[in-house]
Amino acid sequence: MKIISKCLLGVFCCAHFNMALYAKNISIQQAEQAIDQKYAALDFYAVNQQIENDVVDLIRENAESYAYSFPKLTENLRLKINASPDQLLKFYTVDVGGGGTMGEFSSYAQMKSSKSAKLQPLETGYILKIDQVKEGAQPIYLIQSYYKGDSCHGLYQIQAFKMHVQALTAAPVFQTKKKQLSSIEVEYDCHYDEERRGSYIRVAKDLNKIDITLLDQNSRPTGKYLRYQRSNTGYQYTGVTK
């Protein structure tokens, strides 16, 4: 069985077909179907990095990709798509882990205003939600994500980005007592919160408050939160709340 799998993978790797060249000659729907069929019968975790390569090529080589929802890839090959509230940014997340208890994901951002369908790799975990506020006239994108260390440990994160010269750059909008940050993280440990009671990062519906779970020295949730209140220049730490 291993020999057959290796032979199949060899054929498909040579056939990284060339997806970029291939996709130029057919519709985006046909190219998506070709990728879906290429990997449908294979072990996902044995080929997911090749899937990532083909998906990235397909998106980059198709001007229509921004408006396309990729139904087959999201349903069958675990592609996750998010969009910014202003619909000017589209985010793709691909599962590139090995299938064990640890999780690994690759995320990319695509700009609607870009003259090409280029993708920007992002250092995020599995993207959960995207919110948007303004700092003056500048849109600030708040991306919540989760890093899965293993089945029992992980990291919740909120990151702030802004557009600069056709690229997303970190935006240091979180003002602590001592410094400004572009991201805030909080650890998760199932030994202390097996049922994941409550949100580790709470964002108010009006986006005026962001609360971060306060952990004790043993990474145990205290039931309290560190509050960041929105101001004219970002989010200012204001103290501890319940």
Where are these regions (language model features)?
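Bacterial Sec-dependent N-terminal signal peptides
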Residues: 1-30
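Start-of-domain marker
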Residues: 23-89
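Surface-exposed loop/turn elements that mediate protein-protein interactions on large endomembrane-trafficking
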Residues: 60-70, 106-121, 162-172
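Exposed beta-strand-loop-beta-strand "reactive/processing" segments of non-cytosolic proteins
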Residues: 75-97, 139-147
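Short, solvent-exposed coil/turn segments at beta-strand boundaries
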Residues: 83-90, 111-114, 132-140, 203-209, ...
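Residue-level detector of short, conserved catalytic/binding motifs and their immediate flanks
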Residues: 88-90, 159, 226
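Short N-terminal edge-element motif at the start of the domain
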Residues: 90-133
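Short aromatic loop motif centered on NTY/YTY
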Residues: 128-136, 145-149, 154-157, 169-231, ...
